[in-house]
Amino acid sequence: MLYNLLYPLADQVPLFNLFKYLTFRTGGAVLTALIVAFLVGPRIIAWLRQWQKQGQPIRADGPESHLLTKKGTPTMGGFMILLALSVSTLLWADLRNQYVWIVLLVTLGYGLIGFWDDYLKVSKKNPKGVPGKAKLVAEIAIALAAAAWVWSLQREPLAGALAVPFFKTVLLQLSWFYLPFAVFIIVGAGNAVNLTDGLDGLAIVPVMIASGVFAIFSYLVGHAVFANYLQIHYVSGSGELAVFCGALVGAGLGFLWFNAPPAMVFMGDTGSLALGGALGAISVVTKHELVLGIVGGLFVLETVSVIVQVASFKLTGKRVFRMAPLHHHFEKKGWAEPTVVIRFWIIATILALAGLATLKLR
């Protein structure tokens, strides 16, 4: 909004020339989202506590410590993230850019699905929430609409192509199969972050790390000169997503202030589904879906642990892990919650650096 309102006046007010720089607006988005989260956070938490007298239902089969340390903590803290993210993005992004709207609407759509799930958990006191099939259908519908919208904005051979990391300007042509593939990425990312969100601060920091990396990728992929220099594909207009990513980082930092152990609030599915969907949508726009698998490798590990656990139990009657997702396995082994969280943050950082390395290792 500020870009659309103030940059046209740059001839009269030279200071407004700053708004043409993505780096300036991305920095502004980080700070704005952080400030909004700080301002609205205490009020949102107070409202959630008043509404959710007993807090989020805790799994009876989970780690025993959770029944003591997490009981009574309100959920749906994702409201704080989504509000700060949306306000900051609308202020600092170029609102004529359709990619910004695609990613923002996917984020809010998945947030709405998550809210539906959280609401049922709190109101019905049922940890399972929305039936899995209904939830999946809603996620697929939003992802399919987003993928089709992205397809309509990009020309061949880029539209139906998949970029391959570690190879110079290699694009695999998937044609119409790209649509279900993009849906799989968005839905998978949303649910992967959702599965990871089981400990205080565990999901939000890797999300911020991945968002920071994709701010860089968005900027470079959307800049013709840098894309040519790095021998990566060029997606016109995708650089504006750096502003969205910056807003996500700022909103995440603000939320972490209240989610640091012991958490005052949980993001719930309202936040985790939305943030995962956002990362998936960004990777689809920038054509770096495979890089998301590296940068968000921690989310992949958590998801695979659940798949392996369920498959093993159905096929053999035995469990591979003491409990799934993976972070609960280490808790069951005796690791303290802060130990699990910080070590997983370290893993997320290493994987993010590996993802960044794909820019030069070609």
UniProtKB/Swiss-Prot annotation:
It catalyses: UDP-N-acetyl-alpha-D-muramoyl-L-alanyl-gamma-D-glutamyl-meso-2,6-diaminopimeloyl-D-alanyl-D-alanine + di-trans,octa-cis-undecaprenyl phosphate = di-trans,octa-cis-undecaprenyl diphospho-N-acetyl-alpha-D-muramoyl-L-alanyl-D-glutamyl-meso-2,6-diaminopimeloyl-D-alanyl-D-alanine + UMP. Pathway: Cell wall biogenesis; peptidoglycan biosynthesis. CDD domains: GT_MraY. It is found in: Cell inner membrane. Its EC number is 2.7.8.13. One of its GO terms (molecular function) is UDP-N-acetylmuramoyl-L-alanyl-D-glutamyl-meso-2,6-diaminopimelyl-D-alanyl-D-alanine:undecaprenyl-phosphate transferase activity. The keyword Metal-binding applies. InterPro entries: Glycosyl_transferase_4, PNAcMuramoyl-5peptid_Trfase, PNAcMuramoyl-5peptid_Trfase_CS. It is a multi-pass membrane protein. One of its GO terms (cellular component) is plasma membrane. One of its GO terms (biological process) is peptidoglycan biosynthetic process. Its cofactor is Mg(2+). Belongs to the glycosyltransferase 4 family. MraY subfamily. NCBIfam families: mraY. Catalyzes the initial step of the lipid cycle reactions in the biosynthesis of the cell wall peptidoglycan: transfers peptidoglycan precursor phospho-MurNAc-pentapeptide from UDP-MurNAc-pentapeptide onto the lipid carrier undecaprenyl phosphate, yielding undecaprenyl-pyrophosphoryl-MurNAc-pentapeptide, known as lipid I. This is Phospho-N-acetylmuramoyl-pentapeptide-transferase. It comes from Paramagnetospirillum magneticum (strain ATCC 700264 / AMB-1).
